Amino acid sequence: MTKINSGILGTGHSYPEGILTNADLERIVDTSDEWITSRTGIKQRRKAAPDEYTSQFAVRAAREAIARAGIEPADIDLILCATVTPDQILPSTGCLIQAELGAHKASAMDIVAACSGFLYGLTLADSMIRCGQSKHALVIGAEILTRYVDYTDRSTCVLFGDGAGAAVLGAVEEGRGILAARIRSDGRYEEQLFAPGGGTKGGFSAETIARGDHFFKMRGNELFKVAVRSMAEISREVLEEAGLTTTDVKLFIPHQANQRITDAVASKLDVDSSMVYSNIAMHGNTSSASIPIGLDECVESGKIQKGDVVLMASFGGGVTWGGVVMRW
């Protein structure tokens, strides 16, 4: 059987027009621009309008990625949508995206891996392409997180923003594409970042709403330590598997959770700040959308050129984490 190499053929991203600045948050919660910036690096985040929903941004990002890949929606045979903020419980957001795109030949599903969702999707799509089960896979990270934050809790409401990013994967020439990909999870840390309401365990009632059970809960100090360790370790693992070191990496795109986390991971990997991409100041934490948005911004700006080695690492609720290294 002929060996198939899988790589990214096209990228895209989309986010709401609405912007929520630190100054806006100062008026609704006990915080300040200085407090937010010094602890997170965030200056503003995108916020969806009440009549906007996750799949709209996913579809816009997907259309960009498909066009840049030089294919048609009908050529897509696999859609993986990473999200923790779906349009609705049933059907999956992936199926809604499929219908809107007209990608009627595709299998579609959602991935619930929080901030690691996009790298989970890349890893699964890479495997499907390599084994011949898919020719063109669409991987999307899309979120409207601002609907799930408690605007009386300054530890969480300042962090999250909305948006979507997408990538089309397909066969590429030998020596290019995804060189190594790994994903991990550890459910023992479930309560470091979670939302207890809305499921069959926590339920959905006037009481759960009054308690704020549908909002994100986070234990920031504990999460920081596990996130830094896990992202650094899995970055080293994928580099070793690919026969590379950090000196080979042209660009490092970590999940945009918090600037302090990004800086700490970069320090552990001993990589220069000039090769670390950060857009958290303008977008905040967009969970599964953060890496694909960052990736597309780097493609659009010319930060990534053919032959460049790009390293991506993520960490999210679950807890989950992942690492992917590729040659563009």
For the regions a protein language model found, what residue spans apply to each?
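Beta-strand segments within the central parallel beta-sheet cores of soluble alpha/beta enzyme folds
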Residues: I36, D75-A82, M109-V112, K135-A142, ...
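Acidic, glycine-rich active-site loops and adjacent beta-strand->loop/helix elements
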Residues: S14, A82-D87, A113-F118, G141-T146, ...
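Conserved beta-ketoacyl condensing-enzyme motif
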Residues: I8-G10, P50-M109, L119, E241-K268
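Conserved catalytic cysteine-centered active-site region
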Residues: W35-Q56, V84-A137, S267-L295
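Flexible, glycine-rich active-site loops centered on histidine and acidic residues
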Residues: R130-A164
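Catalytic phosphate/nucleotide-handling subdomain of diverse soluble enzymes
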Residues: I293-A313, V319-W328
